[in-house]
């Protein structure tokens, strides 16, 4: 049966990082980011005079984005107290993103684009600025449990040392 391992096929094996991904892939991604830096990953909107701007495409997209924003605000305003609860806001947030993406495709603009990014950032600043991850606070166990956890290994160590020494003397006597 043929093995699927790279070494058997004769190809070079890529060195792996701690997380298991090939180091060459990570270096390639890093090189791409360094050689081609962008302020944002968004695709730029066409300006007037470019082929994609005939008929005021960008202006129409801005109007459509305003519709998406107003619809999102109408959905979010009644939820006011639960803005940090993902179960409550996931639907309006997803609807906003889908709306922005739909109109970007409709007007032959890339997504994400600067206007869509600005809307997303704005909603984060308005609705989610005061949200933080709730992390449980850890406390020490009760004192009796803590003492048991400390004393048990301390008592076991001399017993285990005695057992090892005793067994090693037995093996020396047999040899």
Swiss-Prot record:
Q: Where is the signal peptide?
A: 1-42
Q: What is this protein's function?
A: Accessory protein that interacts with and modulates the function of G-protein coupled receptors including calcitonin gene-related peptide type 1 receptor (CALCRL) and calcitonin receptor (CALCR). Required for the transport of CALCRL to the plasma membrane. Together with CALCRL, form a receptor complex for adrenomedullin/ADM. Together with CALCR, act as a receptor complex for calcitonin/CT/CALC. Together with CALCR, also act as a receptor complex for amylin/IAPP.
Instruction: State any single GO MF term.
Output: coreceptor activity
**Record's protein name:** Receptor activity-modifying protein 2
Q: Does the keyword tRNA processing apply?
A: no
Q: Where do glycans attach?
A: 130
Give the primary localization class: membrane
For this UniProt record, give its keywords in alphabetical order, as a comma-separated list. Cell membrane, Disulfide bond, Glycoprotein, Membrane, Receptor, Signal, Transmembrane, Transmembrane helix, Transport
Top-rank lineage group of the source organism: Eukaryota
Q: Which InterPro entries match?
A: RAMP, RAMP_sf
Cytoplasmic side stretches = 166-175
One GO cellular component term of this record is: lysosome
Subunit note = Heterodimer of CALCRL and RAMP2; the interaction forms the receptor complex for adrenomedullin/ADM. Heterodimer of CALCR and RAMP2; interaction forms the AMYR2 receptor complex for calcitonin/CALC and amylin/IAPP.
């Amino acid at each position: 049966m043929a093995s699927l391992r790279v070494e058997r096929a004769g190809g070079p094996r890529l060195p792996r990082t701690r997380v298991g991904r090939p180091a060459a892939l990570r270096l390639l991604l890093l090189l791409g980011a360094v050689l081609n830096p962008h302020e944002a990953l968004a695709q730029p909107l066409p300006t007037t005079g470019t082929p994609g701007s005939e008929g005021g495409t960008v202006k129409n997209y801005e109007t459509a984005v305003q519709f998406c924003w107003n619809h999102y605000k109408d959905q979010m305003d009644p939820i006011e107290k639960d803005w940090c609860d993902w179960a409550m806001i996931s639907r309006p947030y997803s609807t906003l993103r889908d709306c922005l993406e739909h109109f970007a495709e409709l007007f032959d603009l890339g997504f994400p684009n600067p206007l869509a990014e600005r809307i997303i950032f704005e909603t984060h600043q308005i609705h989610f600025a005061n949200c933080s991850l709730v992390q449980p606070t850890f406390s020490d166990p009760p004192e009796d449990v803590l003492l048991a956890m400390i004393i048990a290994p301390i008592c076991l160590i001399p017993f285990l040392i005695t057992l090892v020494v005793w067994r090693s003397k037995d093996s020396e006597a047999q040899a």
